Amino acid sequence: MDFSQRSFHRSLSSSSQSPGLSMSSSIYRRGVAPSVYGGAGGHGTRISTSRHLANYGSVPAGGNLFAGNEKMTMQNLNDRLASYLERVRSLEQSNSHLEQQIKHWYETNTPSTGRDHSAYMGQIKELRDQIKDAQLQNARCVLQIDNAKLAMEDFRLKYEAERGICQTVVADLHGLKRVFDELTLTKADLEIQIEELTKDLHLLQKEHEEEVRSLRAHLGNNVNVEVDAPPSLNLGAIMNEMRQKYDAMAQENLQKAKEQFEIQINDLQQQVTVSTEELKGTKDQIKEQRHTYQVLELELQSLLNMKEALEHTLEETNARYGSHLAKIQARLNSLEGQLVQVRTDTERQIHEYNILLDIKIRLEQEIATYRRLLEGEDVKEYQLSTLDEKDIKKTRKIKTVVQEVVDGKVVSSEVKEVEESV
């Protein structure tokens, strides 16, 4: 028997009606010996009859049933009994053969519920551990990426702060340069003023000498007239005193200007030195932070590449197990479809078996009746019965199973039965 899966299954069965029994007392009777034949499984089972004409004559009321042709009747009944017994044995053998085939099919095709999957548990556990390790590694990578981002943000803030400080120092340097330029200009102005004052002093000395010479020349040509007057002023002494006074003031102003200039120059040099050192330290720190930033950027890039590789591996693992799961699901759907087919075939065979069992029961009843007749039970109450041939009605039953399969899975199943006469 073939239990392969099909979308449409047709099972044909034919039922037959055995000839009915009629009781009559006509002179000519037809002796009927029915026999049953059919294939394995009960397909195409029908009952055929063999007939012969016998002239029994008239049977008187209350006469013997086997009067006239008793030997032929007994032989006919024995033949029919042997035929029935042989048919019963044949049906029993066919039934046992069908049961063995069904049992064999269930043993070979039905998936075992107690199947040992322990061989796969180790591999499944190992794969689950790998998936968990990959997930943990992915989480670690994400955490490291977040930490790197936070560190990068901190370094960026520090870099911005140091750059602001550097810009402030540069601005201070520019301011100090401007102050230095102003002091240089002030120094030049003071030097110019000193030169001008020196020139004025020389000019005043020349004028004083000229005035003294002119006065001496004028006094030498005049008569010395003595008058009673207060003593005249000593212009030379006054000029010398004024010259000394102005020289002292010029020297004092020059000394003060030099001291102030030196003080400002020293302060400016100290500020420039400090600013230069700070600028150098800031440049070194900026260089170090730039190097750290490049290192962190490389680490971030490597972590991103590792993350992409892990995500790709995870996707491949999910796809591989998804395809494996889809294959298992398709196999499960196929087995479910085969199970539905087996159940349908089993129900059909049970139906056919019930038909054969009914035929067997009727045959056993007829055998029991014939046995009673042979044993002589109530012989006087029976008259010779004849089996008139009746029209055998054949029917064909078409069973159609329609299954809708989507992605290897049985979505719906519909069974249609159509019975038509042949």
Swiss-Prot record:
InterPro entries: IF_conserved (IPR018039), IF_rod_dom (IPR039008), Keratin_I (IPR002957). The modification Phosphoserine is found at S13, S16, S26. Residues 216-238 are annotated as: Linker 12. Hyperphosphorylation at Ser-13 occurs during the early stages of apoptosis but becomes less prominent during the later stages. Phosphorylation at Ser-13 also increases in response to stress brought on by cell injury. Plays a significant role in maintaining keratin filament organization in intestinal epithelia. When phosphorylated, plays a role in the secretion of mucin in the small intestine. PANTHER family: INTERMEDIATE FILAMENT, KERATIN, TYPE I CYTOSKELETAL 20. Belongs to the intermediate filament family. This is Keratin, type I cytoskeletal 20. The gene is KRT20.
